[in-house]
Amino acid sequence: MKIALLANPARGEINVLLATAYELIRLGHEVVFLTGSSFRNAIAEFKDEQNDKLLASRIQFSDLGTAKAFEDFTRGMQSHLKGLRKPPGDYSSMEICQIVALVTEQEFREAATLVRDRLLELDPDMIAVDALSPNLVTGCRMTGLPWMFTVPCSPSLTATRKSLFDPHPMGSRRQRTLMSALENLKLTIRETYGNAIKKDLYARRALLKKEFGLNSMGFNADSAIVPPLWKDRNCVGGIHFNTPGLWDSIRQPHQITFVGCGVTSDPENHSPSQAGTPISEIAGWSPLTKLSTSFDQSGQGERDLDVEWMDAAYAAGESVVYLNMGSMFLWTDDEVRACLRAFERLHRESGGKIKLLFKLNKPKRNPGSPGFTSPLNSPTAVATPKWDEKRPIDSRRPSGVSTLIMAEKLSEAIKNVKPRRKTDAEKGYSQFMLSEFEGLEYVRFTRWVHDQRRIYKHPALRVVIHHGGGNSFNEAVHYGLPQMILSQWFDTHEYAILAERFGIGLRSKHAPFVDEQDMFAKMLRLLRGPEAEKIQANAKIWSTRSRNAGGAPAAARLLETHALLHRQRKQARDPTPTAKTSLSVDTTEVATPTFTDTETSLSPKILSSAASTVTNP
């Protein structure tokens, strides 16, 4: 069968669809990606990674062009980064996300019409579209074909709010108290006012109802970041890439299936993590007990210097903390220094046993430029890191130097590091060169992570620090890793609150700012003592719950089921002999076990009887 997958080419949105496509082609289905031109190279790489001509032939790319409506909004977000970074409860953060995705009335009309026409031409058996891509969603709705949506963001964005005690997605008070109700009222009023005064939003709502003939979902809902898409008459359900139960928004629609982290069935994603050494072994900063077998690097392809650095740390009885703030975040010089000072103190406190793997994003252009409106910011292929940006940092301590002298040198090195900025327009964003940090033995900086799974599963890794993005949060949950969340904007604050509420991590006290003392204190709590042991135990429990949800394989099977149902209904309306023959072939294909010998295949009769429960809201 043919499955169409649509999303903005931003990695946060499309990564879960790539994982789902990985599963679909192994089920024997054809996958067609519909997205912007900038993702062409990534699709070519995805096909090459299959190492199988038959599997690669099942992956197709339908180029939607270079219009603003189809291009990666990562750079647009970066151009608004200073306004986007707000504390929990500040609605302006959500408003900026809305503005970045907004296009003019004519651009919206052209984009939705193009998507509709392309899909009708493809005539897929099922459509899956990213819920955060409004231009693509509208095109799907216009086809009249059955479709599904995928959700890579926080749970509250899909929750139904029936009272003021139900938390607003931007709410900082989420305990269903009187104060939280007042905050929710304030945020709702601000949201309604903002939706009413934006001309482009007004024009879009008019297009949906008058020109496109689509049903309204409500005044605020039609303009929401994630509308209640399950209310559309042709929507057959949604797939939420979050762990079931890991939420504080209790009214989740029954049409949405929570499948956990969007990881594939590749054994690399599911073999037992070696990071399960009891936290008590490092509670007193003692060296870790080595595992009976060395860390396996066989069959991993090209050399990975980050993993080699972690190997050396593990061999020396040292622990590693991994810091990755996602693809949109840009560091300032002060924030980089604050992190370095915090980890210098941790390194000293632990007797040299704690190290930091730091992924440092580099601005690819002027963050203050107007984004897509400038011809200078036309989309380019994803740049691969240069070799000199990945230079290894020696993990060995100089012999004959006392800890005190070394600490003084490290402090001096941090103070003396001076930023190198390309232009005055980029002032404020870190332009550090990686070579400037080679004297700091406790940290390795990297621009590019080759295989994040190998880092997550490494026995030296103890804690993950991230910005609270949906993928980062759920990957840490999947691999059972304690989290320190430096939440920055929009729904990242919700993930930070959830991590603390469910005891799987801690969050920054002064979000969105990076504070040295707060980071140092929180890392101590995560790395040693009874609280660290409790958090690690909770992380393991939620890891099991995430894996049980099924991930990308579950998403693929759900899409397959709906696709088969649609094809059967379509063939039932066409009583020709050809259709009957095709139906029998499809039934045979689906009856073949795919994942395990004991898995029960879905017969057409069973699927037909289940149709009413999954297609009707």
From Swiss-Prot:
Record field: compositional bias (Polar residues): 371-381, 578-603
Mutant lacking the gene: phenotype: Impairs the production of mannosylerythritol lipids (MELs). Leads to low-temperature sensitivity and affect the cell morphology by impairing formation of filamentous forms.
Pathway linked to the protein: Secondary metabolite biosynthesis
The EC number(s) this enzyme carries: 2.4.1.-
Region Disordered: start-end pairs: 365-396, 567-617
Key words, A-Z: Glycosyltransferase, Transferase
UniProt similarity note: Belongs to the UDP-glycosyltransferase family.
Induction remarks: Expression is induced when cells are grown in cultures containing vegetable oil as the carbon source.
Statement on biotechnological application from the UniProt entry: MELs not only have high potential as eco-friendly biosurfactants due to their excellent surface activity, but also have attracted considerable recent interest because of thei runique properties, including self-assembly, anti-tumor and cell differentiation induction activities, and moisturizing and hair-repairing properties.
Biased composition (Basic and acidic residues): 386-396
InterPro entries with a match to the protein in the record: UDP-glycosyltransferase
GO MF annotation list: UDP-glycosyltransferase activity
Organism annotation: Pseudozyma antarctica (strain T-34) (Yeast)
Entry-linked Gene3D superfamilies: Glycogen Phosphorylase B
Record-linked PANTHER family: EG:EG0003.4 PROTEIN-RELATED (PTHR48043), GLYCOSYLTRANSFERASE FAMILY 1 PROTEIN (PTHR48043:SF151)
Protein's name according to its UniProt entry: Erythritol-mannosyl-transferase 1
Function: Glycosyltransferase; part of the gene cluster that mediates the biosynthesis of mannosylerythritol lipids (MELs), surface-active substances that enhance the availability of water-insoluble substrates.
